[in-house]
Amino acid sequence: MIQQQTLLKVGDNTGARKLMCIRVLGGSKRRYASVGDVIIASVKEATPGGVVKKGDVVRAVVVRTKKAVKRPDGSYIRFNENAAVIINEQNNPRGTRIFGPVARELREKDFMKIISLAPEVL
C-alpha cells in the first residue's frame, strides 16, 4: 500500500536510489497504490552520472510492496521492501536492468518489458 509521502527504493539502474510518492494515478480520489499501479514520484536520492537526478519528477510502477497482495487462488505475496521501477510515457522502463524480484501481477497490467528484464518473477 503506497500513498503520498511514501519512500520507495528504486529497482533499476537509472541512477535514482530513493523515490517519494507524490500522486497515485487512476482517479481523483485514489489514495493507495499496490503492485502494478503507476505513481508520480520525486527522486530523493540519486547517484552521480545517472539518467535521472535528485529533484526530478518521474513516473514509476510499483513492483514490490510490504503489504501482502492477495492472488486469485487465495495465496498472498509480500516482499520486505517497497520498490518501484521508473518508466516513460509509453510504460517502458527508462533503465536497462531491473534488480530484485518482481510480482506476477505486472504481467496482467501489461508491463511485459519489465517482466522480461527482471531476474525473477514471483
Curated annotation (Swiss-Prot):
SMART domains: Ribosomal_L14 (SM01374). Keywords: Ribonucleoprotein, Ribosomal protein, RNA-binding, rRNA-binding. It comes from the Bacteria. GO terms for molecular function: large ribosomal subunit rRNA binding; structural constituent of ribosome. Signal peptide: none annotated. Gene3D superfamilies: Ribosomal protein L14 (2.40.150.20). GO terms for biological process: translation. GO terms for cellular component: cytosolic large ribosomal subunit. It holds the Pfam family Ribosomal_L14. Belongs to the universal ribosomal protein uL14 family. Part of the 50S ribosomal subunit. Forms a cluster with proteins L3 and L19. In the 70S ribosome, L14 and L19 interact and together make contacts with the 16S rRNA in bridges B5 and B8. Binds to 23S rRNA. Forms part of two intersubunit bridges in the 70S ribosome. This is Large ribosomal subunit protein uL14. It comes from Moorella thermoacetica (strain ATCC 39073 / JCM 9320).
